[in-house]
Every structure is written in C-alpha cells, then in structure tokens.
C-alpha cells in the first residue's frame, strides 16, 4: 500500500504539500500533532516540546526522553504498517528508510523565499526577525535528527526525492511527489525486498492508533 514520509524546512510549503499529496492519493495525513495525541495515551506529554526545541546533550540521557523517542519510532512503523499514509516527520527517512514501499521526500527552498512565505503567512513586518526564527528552527531540527538518530536531515542518500519550492510551485511539487509515489509503489514488490508488511505492531499501540486515526492497523486486533 505504501507510505510517504515528508521532511520539510519551515517556510517551504511542506505542510501544505504533504496534505495535498494525501488528499490526491486518498491517503491519511499524519503530522507531529497526531503522534503527540497517540503518545499522550501512554502518559508521554512532552513530545512536541522535545520535537520543536532541539535537544540538549542532557536531554539525550533522560529516561523519559529516550522512552518518547522509542515510542515515536514504534508509532512511525505502526503507521507505515497501516499503509496509505503521508507522514510529515523530521525523522521518517531515518526510521522507515529500510523499507522498499516507503518513499522518503525532502522539501527545501532558499532562505529568501522561506522568509517571504513566513512573512506573508503570519502577517509579519520584520523580515530580519522572520529569518532569525527560521534559522533557529533549522538548528533545532538538525539537533533533533542528529542527536537522537545520528543522521543529518539534508543527507543526499536519505531521500528518494528532493523538491525545491524556490523553483517549483506547490501544485507542481504535489504532482511530483504523487507521481513519484505511484511509480515507487508499483516497483516496490520485488522478490526479497523488505516491506512494511513485515512490521509487527503491538496490539495496545494498534488500539491507540485506531482511537486517533479511526481505523485499525492491518493484521492486528484492537
């Protein structure tokens, strides 16, 4: 069935593109807020704070944080097992990169265009402040990926497709991702390839996902 992960820089239009791709393909759309709702069913309430802030070195040894990351990885795999889903995630490529039926996408844009988008979408007047905010967000993003996953969010081999919305419209980007997914999923059933169908999902987690997503993970009883 396939899963698409989308990693995007703030101000690139990645959220809109991910939602549009999901709508075009008839897939579910999942972002960090969805994952946070699932984690809260386990009493883990600090995911979004950790996700957005960029972890310190001390954060790496806190038991609660390590549990959050472990559970988040399980959630991403369980969502992938569900299939027909677009996951907006900084680390989807790191968690699901080994599956033949996962298309990992990176959305980027030059800083100047990102500033323009943020200024326009948030009604800001101070472009310098907007750029500073974007750079801080980039730093937090990179720290989260590097410190918890030992990966780099802009590594060339991490993605099957990279789209630059500095030169590509949101409409064209949506079309490119959807077409790439259709092509990738047609050729993913290669003999010996590891697919998301091999993922085993804990029944309790499957139930939590069903509560949030509205339908069960295939192959599980909730």
Residue ranges and their predicted role:
Residues 5-21:
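Glycine-rich phosphate-binding P-loop
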Residues 35-87, 124:
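ATP-dependent small-molecule kinase phosphotransfer cores
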Residues 100-121, 128-134:
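Conserved phosphate-donor/acceptor-positioning beta-strand/loop module used by diverse small-molecule
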Residues 89-93:
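Short, polar loop motifs at secondary-structure junctions
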Residues 179-206:
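N-terminal presequence-like segments and adjacent domain-start helices
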Residues 127-170, 201-218:
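Small-molecule kinase domains that catalyze NTP-dependent phosphoryl transfer to phosphate-bearing small molecules
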Residues 24-30:
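Post-Walker A helix-loop "phosphate-sensing" segment adjacent to the P-loop in P-loop NTPases
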